[in-house]
Amino acid sequence: MPTKGILVLTPEGFQFFVFMPPTSNLASLPLRFFSPALDLLPGCLHQRLCPELSDSDWVRLGVQRCLAPQSSGRGFLQTLASLAPSLCPDNSHFFESLKSQRRLDLCAELNAKLCVHARRVLPDALAAFPCLAGFDIHAGDGHYHAHAVHDPADSKGNKHPVGHLYARNLRYGTLSHLTVNDQVTRKKEHDMRGLKRQTIDTLRQGAKKGRKVLYVWERAGIDFNQWHDWKQGSGIYMLSRCKANMALVKCGDLPFERGDAINAGIQSDELVGSGKAGVLLRRVIFIDVLTGITYEYLTNLLQSSVPPGVIAHLYKMRWDIEKSFDEVKNKLGEKKAWASSATAKSMQAQFICLSVNLLQLIEDEIGKEGIVNQAEVKRRAARLEAAQEQAASQNAVLPKTLVMMQQMTQHSVKLIRWVAAQLWLNVPWKAACEVLIALYSKLYGPSIGRHCKHRNLWDSIRLISTPNYTSPALDTIVNTATYGIASA
């Protein structure tokens, strides 16, 4: 029986590497990166046998499309055809597959399974708060992409951006797609209208029976009666901020420990009535000691066992999903819809979520091997130290939650470009990690790549070769990864 392996470009030329288990140092980075998703694929109900473009290849293509520097689908396929022609489908086949409802259902099912897998292996950012042990907690919000090239214009000749609703798990940092905006009757859909279209299973995000779910949403997610119904019938809670025009009636105070540093900045913890809606709510008033700004938070989580300082911090963590959107737009470059159909737009969103979640898993994996972006750690520590000094100068203290919760909210550009480059190169895991260590050890790339748009991606490629080693294959990889073109 022939040995299975892969031909890999190395400093010594092309070498044959035998396929190894995903956890082996000789296994390629693509195998380690994709294995959490591909290992779950056989258990998906929507998987089918497709000889021309298998489901596993489709998942890899979609994720690699998100990570690739090319801004267009055709540019991505041209690069793929240059580097791996056997893996590249026809343009028409790729774009037709984006319209497949079955493949969309598969991607949604796969991402849901991947999020469940992540809960078992990733650290819990909220583990320090036992009062939240019975809750799955998500930050939710809307995010827009620019219209697709072939989207139809309205009667005034305008093309509309594409809106999506996403949820980020605040415990594990995983990203889920809830829905794409109504593409038929409304081009700009209100958040609550989009949420009301979702099933209870979608909103519960795979939470087990008996477990509560809390959504942290900005003011566009307020509908007291709807959240009351979801809370009573399905254990789904909300946390938001008060609107200026709300007529709330104070019904009483909830006791809390003012001397506890976790409640620093809390002015009051109250029960309030929502007037016409007739729903009892909890209002937490908090003053930020660094800015002096007063915030009023509103939730239907009435249990005083959850301190008001934790309520205030959970809303502060809502910013994590905004950081995810910034990563998607500015680091992954996903600014524009891939195609015109609602199915294709939802497919793109699912691939974005898969990409972010696989990055979350691979970053955790390399962190367990001691590979950490120390520059980012030092910057975060410096920001905390500056905040503590500012608070001390005002004879105040920072909330304990802010000091306790010092985790990364985005993946670094270096990590993303490293993964993107290594997916093309297919080098062994240990060699790929050595490249990342070298990238993390310096602030800037080599002078020869200083003016490249994707400088860190160029570095990732350069670091596997010796200074005197060149080849047409390496030239092709450098040109396509950096400029999106193949060598002549």
Regions found by a protein language model. Give the residues of each.
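Basic, amphipathic alpha-helical segments enriched in Lys/Arg and hydrophobic/aromatic residues
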Residues: 338-364
